[in-house]
């Protein structure tokens, strides 16, 4: 039977000399956030708000919301020392039905849709950069196949954890990210200062659309580009003097990112009119074609490289999330399998890729971003309610925590809730996908996981146990992996309790018999 288990709370206790200082924490935040979003969402934002001025205001507002969220999640992460983010905190609160429902959204929408958006954008930049022109149907399938080919290639690379290659490529992707953003900013401001291209900035708020629905959709798109602001939440104990370093690094890091994003969008707006941006499928390419002449090919090449890096990062995070969910007993333990020779969650990788390929057919990148944003911010509203519950009721938390003025989590909770409610009222079709999966997750939990429903049946427990063990053995043979599971007692570590070792689900040793077959022995 699939049970609800606790999550791992292990964090390395590094020496002071190995810990991250202020500069390291700032670079960690900036490096994790600045990426593909700035080349994906500008068109969506200006399409929703219809003006340069309001689109820039959206970028600034998204930076402030992300900064506020980052502070709140730092308090949460230092109060409850669990890996696994929102899902782990909801489990800690014993809100298992809610945690399970949002886990379903995370596995089927959040990560897969993000991967699909990045793959589709990669294909768009490659096709536009290469000047390939096909009829509409052929172009649709050609772009899909190119995106799928890339993520399948990256999947096999992650199967064998080619760390040396991945690390080197990550450096290349980081350089491409820096070069592309600097090139766009410098070029745009060159045309403003020396060529006097000011026409698009003269009436920045002309024609602005202030309707709540489009405004929230634009804000969702902006926040998608700032995604990753909770990164320090996963490594509070890795930071030197966290009570000083973490707040300063958030303020400085998020301010730097906000300045970079606004500068890039000002550069776009100097060169391209709102009409041109709305009509663009690859805004950086149209920018380059209008300003760089024969050197315009450099931009799509750099964007394609950084998108590959972003795809690999998303795939890495998503597969570990799926594997962690399996370790906790929410989904079959076969998915928790880790390759013993390279620590790769191969089954989780494959499952994630298959879901991402299916999700990519749900709509264009803008539609997928709305699905992701609604699901994410719904979950964050529940997570903030958990933090407020802990604060107001005075429940046990880790003694060495960072505690904010309570007005900050209250304000962030209101922001999350407001965006979700407005999205439901004004764009119910986009919200319906997330709401449907959320409701489906609750129904599945009540029927198949809740111990007063089917799991109370001895026959059901035996059947699910047999299916779980047989599927685990099958996946071990196919992928050469060993499944894992964590124990409930590890929850004690979350608030500074005693440590306990991870338990493992039944594992099997696979050995050849010499006649072309294999023997499976329970360990």
UniProtKB/Swiss-Prot annotation:
Keywords, ordered alphabetically: Amino-acid transport, Cell membrane, Glycoprotein, Membrane, Transmembrane, Transmembrane helix, Transport
Extracellular face of the membrane: 41-51, 108-145, 195-214, 271-290, 370-404, 451-523
Entry-listed glycosylation sites: 289, 462
Motif mapping: PDZ-binding motif: 521-523
Principal location class: membrane
Keyword Transmembrane tagged: yes
Transmembrane segments: 20-40, 52-72, 87-107, 146-166, 174-194, 215-235, 250-270, 291-311, 349-369, 405-425, 430-450
GO biological process, one term: amino acid transmembrane transport
Membrane topology reported for the UniProt record: Multi-pass membrane protein
Recorded GO CC terms: amino acid transport complex; apical plasma membrane
Gene3D superfamilies: Amino acid/polyamine transporter I
Tissue specificity: Expressed at the apical cell membrane of intestinal cells.
Cytoplasmic side: 1-19, 73-86, 167-173, 236-249, 312-348, 426-429
Compartment list: Apical cell membrane
Recorded superkingdom: Eukaryota
InterPro entries recorded: AA/rel_permease1, AminoAcid_Transporter
One term of GO molecular function: PDZ domain binding
Signal peptide bounds: none
Pfam families: AA_permease_2
Subunit structure of this chain's protein: Interacts (via PDZ-binding motif) with nfrl-1 (via PDZ 2 domain); the interaction with nrfl-1 is required to sequester aat-6 to the apical cell membrane of intestinal cells.
Family according to the record: Belongs to the amino acid-polyamine-organocation (APC) superfamily.
General function of this protein: Amino acid transporter that mediates the uptake of the L-enantiomers of various amino acids, including L-glutamate. May play a role in promoting fertility.
Protein's name according to its UniProt entry: Amino acid transporter protein 6
Organism name: Caenorhabditis elegans
Gene: aat-6
């Amino acid at each position: 039977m699939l049970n609800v288990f606790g999550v791992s709370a292990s964090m390395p206790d590094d020496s002071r000399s190995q810990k991250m200082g202020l500069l390291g924490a700032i670079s960690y935040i900036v490096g994790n956030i600045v990426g593909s979003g700035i080349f994906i969402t500008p068109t969506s934002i200006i399409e929703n708000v219809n003006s340069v001025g309001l689109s820039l205001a959206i970028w600034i507002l998204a930076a402030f919301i992300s900064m506020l969220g980052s502070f709140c999640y730092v308090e949460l992460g230092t109060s409850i020392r669990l890996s696994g983010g929102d899902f782990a905190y909801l489990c800690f609160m014993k809100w298992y039905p809610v945690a399970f429902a949002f886990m379903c959204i995370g596995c089927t929408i959040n990560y897969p849709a993000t991967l699909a958006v990045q793959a589709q954008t990669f294909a768009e930049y490659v096709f536009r950069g290469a000047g390939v022109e096909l009829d509409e149907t052929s172009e649709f399938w050609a772009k899909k196949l190119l995106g799928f080919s890339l993520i399948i290639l990256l999947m096999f690379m992650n199967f064998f954890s080619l760390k040396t290659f991945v690390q080197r490529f990550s450096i290349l992707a980081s350089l491409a990210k820096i070069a592309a953003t600097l090139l766009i900013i410098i070029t745009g401001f060159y045309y403003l200062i020396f060529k006097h291209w000011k026409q698009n900035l003269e009436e920045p708020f002309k024609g602005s659309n202030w309707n709540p629905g489009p405004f929230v959709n634009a804000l969702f798109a902006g926040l998608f580009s700032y995604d990753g602001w909770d990164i320090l939440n996963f490594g509070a104990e890795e930071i030197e003097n966290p009570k000083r370093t973490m707040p300063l690094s958030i303020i400085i890091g998020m301010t730097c990112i906000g300045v970079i994003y606004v500068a890039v969008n000002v550069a776009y707006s100097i060169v391209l009119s709102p009409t041109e941006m709305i009509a663009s499928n690859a805004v950086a390419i149209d920018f380059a074609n209008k300003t760089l002449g024969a050197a315009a090919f450099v931009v799509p090449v750099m964007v394609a490289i950084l998108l590959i890096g972003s795809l690999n990062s998303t795939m890495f995070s998503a597969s570990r999330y799926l594997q962690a969910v399996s370790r906790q007993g929410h989904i079959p333990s076969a998915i928790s399998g880790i390759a013993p020779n390279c620590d790769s969650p191969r089954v989780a990788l494959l499952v994630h890729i298959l879901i991402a390929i299916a999700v990519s057919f749900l709509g264009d990148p803008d539609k997928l971003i709305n699905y992701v944003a609604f699901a994410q911010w719904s979950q964050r509203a529940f997570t903030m309610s958990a933090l407020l519950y802990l604060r107001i009721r005075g429940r046990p938390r880790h003694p060495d925590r960072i505690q904010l003025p309570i007005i900050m989590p209250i304000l962030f909770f209101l922001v999350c809730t407001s965006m979700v409610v407005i999205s439901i009222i004004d764009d119910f079709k986009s919200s319906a996908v997330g709401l449907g999966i959320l409701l489906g997750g609750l129904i599945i939990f009540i029927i198949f996981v809740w111990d007063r429903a089917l799991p109370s049946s001895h026959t059901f427990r035996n059947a699910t146990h047999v299916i779980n063990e047989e599927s685990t053995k099958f996946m071990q043979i196919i992928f050469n992996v060993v499944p894992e599971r964590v124990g409930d007692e590890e929850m004690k570590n979350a608030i500074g309790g005693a440590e306990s070792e991870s338990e493992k689900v039944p594992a099997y040793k696979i050995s050849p018999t010499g006649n072309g077959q294999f023997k499976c022995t329970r360990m």
